Each structure stands twice: as structure tokens, then as C-alpha cells.
């Protein structure tokens, strides 16, 4: 993952900015999507268009709170198993976050580079597709995603909080949260589910069988690992192991990034009306699509 000190420094700086930021001041809008002003700038987005990807870059794409830090750890461990070199990115790994000069600095980083993003497919720099970088896309069911996002806002000190779960749910459904609508993100990425160099991973599948998931990721990236190596990485990458080490790897925010990781945690907060509204939105946006089928909505989201 990113160099520990760089990651922690960046997060600490973002949290410091958040202290004086209210919910009404939290967002900047770029090309119709809201982003957190504590992490993103218009200048960085404009500079991103000229980012030069490499063919051996690995891009990890996800909507917020769908497991991006988990996948980043897994891919870092896979690279270590192959190269015997600990992966350490000198920048905060989220591609669209940071200052506008970061992309010049990234030209000096050794390969392979691991990049993460919460952007829609069509908001990414064209060089990613031109140079055929590999893209891992991780999805999580929308109900657990919403609940995890709510707890992140309301549990982390200094981040603007919502008055209630009901208030957050209304904003989530409308797409008025950081990085916008879950469903717009899903619709956009669904168009590319069968693209070359793109692989979709389900958070719930990793929870059910981490060894199989890691093996699939390894094969997609073209790595040849033994079963023993896969087992070792799996042991180091369980949610409990990640949570136990979270303060060391991610600083004070670590325990909030790895809060529970449960499948079905949404049942503690969703009321019947909210269930119906989310079910209708899923049906309207994703029912019958390849991604909709992959999400196994009936298994994970119907009470």
C-alpha cells in the first residue's frame, strides 16, 4: 500500500481540514458529481486528464466503502510474493485525491504502480485504456455500502456528521454524498464488465471464500503463486487481521476504515420504507444487467 507515513499524513491533513467544514460546505462539484473538498480540488481533476498510465499499472476501482483498502492490501501482498519487494507508494493512492503536481511526481515511481479510484469509468484518464492497464473493480451490495458510509461519517472524529441515519439515507439515495450516486457509478461500470483487462470482484465473495478470491485476482494479474503462498496472503488479509493492524497501517482512522465488514449489517438500520425504496432503485437501475446478477441482490439485500 502507500508509504505509511505519507498515507497517515495525508489523512491527518484531510481530517484537520474537516474540523472547520460543515456538511453544507463539504462538496465541490466537478462534471456533475460531488466530491469532498477536504480531499479533491478542481485543479487536480483538470491535471488528471494528462496523467500517463503504464501498461503494468494496476487500477483498483470502487465506490466508497466497498473494500478498496482491503483490495489494496491484497494486491500489495501479491506483488510482494512475486517480486520479494514490499510495495510502498510514496503518494496517497487514490488517483483523484491530492495536489495537482502529484502526477508529475508519479512518473518517477517504480513499476508496477497500484492506483485506486472512486471515479466512474468514463471519468478516468484515457491513457489507462490506451496503455491497457489492468483494472480490478470491487463492488459491495448497496445496503451494506450505505450503512458503512453512514458510520464512517458519524464515527470518525472531525468528519462532518449527519443528524440521523434517515437524513444520510435520503442523501445517499439522491446521490448527494461524496463521489455521488452508488447507482450511477454501478450503471457506468456495468457497461464495461466484459471489457478486456477489466475484472469485477464482489466484496461478499471475498468474505465467503478469501482464498478463492485471492487466487482469481492473482490469475487476472498474471501472477503464478503456489497454493501455500495464496494461503499465507489469505491469512494476512482476513478482515479481522486487517482490523487488528489498522492503526499501524492507517493511523488513527484505521479502526474506522475496518469497522465491522459484516454482510447484512444493513438490517440494523434500514426500516421497511427504506428497504422498499432501495429495492425499487436497484430494480430500476441494475435488474437484469450483468452487474445486477453478479451482486446477488436477492441473497444479500432482501430481508
From Swiss-Prot:
Enzyme Commission designation: 2.8.2.n2
| Catalytically driven reaction(s) | thyroxine + 3'-phosphoadenylyl sulfate = thyroxine sulfate + adenosine 3',5'-bisphosphate + H(+)
GO annotation, cellular component aspect: cytosol
Arranged from A to Z, the UniProt key words for this protein are: Cytoplasm, Transferase
In which tissues or organs does this protein occur? Expressed in brain, heart, kidney, thymus, lung, liver and testis.
What domain of life does the native source organism fall in? Eukaryota
Q: Which residues bind 3'-phosphoadenylyl sulfate?
A: 65-70, 140, 148, 203, 237-242, 259-261
- Which GO molecular function annotations are given, in alphabetical order? sulfotransferase activity
| Keyword Acetylation among record annotations | no
**What Pfam families is this protein classified in?**
Sulfotransfer_1
State if Kinase is listed as a keyword. Answer: no
What does the record say about pH dependence? Optimum pH is 8.
Residue numbers annotated as active site: 118
User: What InterPro entries does the record point to?
Assistant: P-loop_NTPase (IPR027417), Sulfotransferase_dom (IPR000863)
Give the UniProt subcellular location, in the record's own words: Cytoplasm, Cytosol
What the entry lists under PANTHER family is as follows:
SULFOTRANSFERASE SULT
- What family is it from? Belongs to the sulfotransferase 1 family.
Q: What does this protein do?
A: Sulfotransferase that utilizes 3'-phospho-5'-adenylyl sulfate (PAPS) as sulfonate donor to catalyze the sulfate conjugation of thyroxine. Involved in the metabolism of thyroxine.
For this entry, the protein name equals Sulfotransferase 6B1
Lineage of the organism:
Eukaryota, Metazoa, Chordata, Craniata, Vertebrata
Amino acid at each position: 500500500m502507500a508509504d505509511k507515513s505519507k498515507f497517515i499524513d495525508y489523512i491527518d491533513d484531510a481530517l484537520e481540514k474537516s474540523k472547520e467544514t460543515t456538511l453544507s460546505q463539504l462538496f465541490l462539484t466537478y462534471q456533475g458529481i460531488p466530491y469532498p473538498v477536504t480531499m479533491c480540488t478542481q485543479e487536480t481533476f483538470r491535471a488528471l486528464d494528462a496523467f500517463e498510465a503504464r501498461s503494468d499499472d494496476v487500477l483498483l476501482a470502487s465506490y466508497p466503502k466497498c473494500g478498496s483498502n482491503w483490495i489494496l492490501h491484497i494486491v500489495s501482498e501479491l506483488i510482494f510474493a512475486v517480486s520479494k519487494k514490499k510495495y510502498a507508494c510514496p503518494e496517497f493512492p487514490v488517483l483523484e485525491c491530492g495536489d495537482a503536481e502529484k502526477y508529475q511526481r508519479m512518473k518517477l515511481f517504480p513499476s508496477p504502480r497500484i492506483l485506486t479510484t472512486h471515479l466512474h469509468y468514463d471519468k478516468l484518464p484515457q491513457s489507462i485504456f490506451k496503455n491497457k492497464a489492468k483494472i480490478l473493480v470491487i463492488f459491495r451490495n448497496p445496503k451494506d455500502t450505505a450503512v458503512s458510509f453512514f458510520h464512517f461519517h458519524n464515527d470518525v472524529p472531525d468528519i462532518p456528521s449527519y443528524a440521523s441515519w434517515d437524513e444520510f439515507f435520503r442523501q445517499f439515495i439522491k446521490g448527494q454524498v461524496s463521489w455521488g450516486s452508488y447507482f450511477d457509478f454501478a450503471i457506468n461500470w456495468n457497461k464495461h464488465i466484459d471489457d478486456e483487462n477489466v475484472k469485477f470482484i464482489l466484496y461478499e465473495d471475498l468474505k465467503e471464500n478469501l482464498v478463492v478470491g485471492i487466487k482469481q485476482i492473482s490469475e487476472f494479474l498474471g501472477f503464478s503463486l503456489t497454493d501455500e503462498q495464496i494461503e499465507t496472503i489469505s491469512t494476512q488479509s482476513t478482515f479481522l487481521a486487517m482490523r487488528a493492524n489498522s492503526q499501524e497501517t492507517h493511523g488513527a482512522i484505521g479502526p474506522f476504515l475496518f469497522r465491522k465488514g459484516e454482510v447484512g449489517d444493513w438490517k440494523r438500520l434500514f426500516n421497511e420504507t427504506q428497504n422498499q425504496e432501495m429495492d425499487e432503485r436497484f430494480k430500476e437501475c441494475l435488474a437484469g444487467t450483468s452487474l445486477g446478477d453478479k451482486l446477488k441482490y436477492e441473497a444479500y439485500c432482501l430481508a
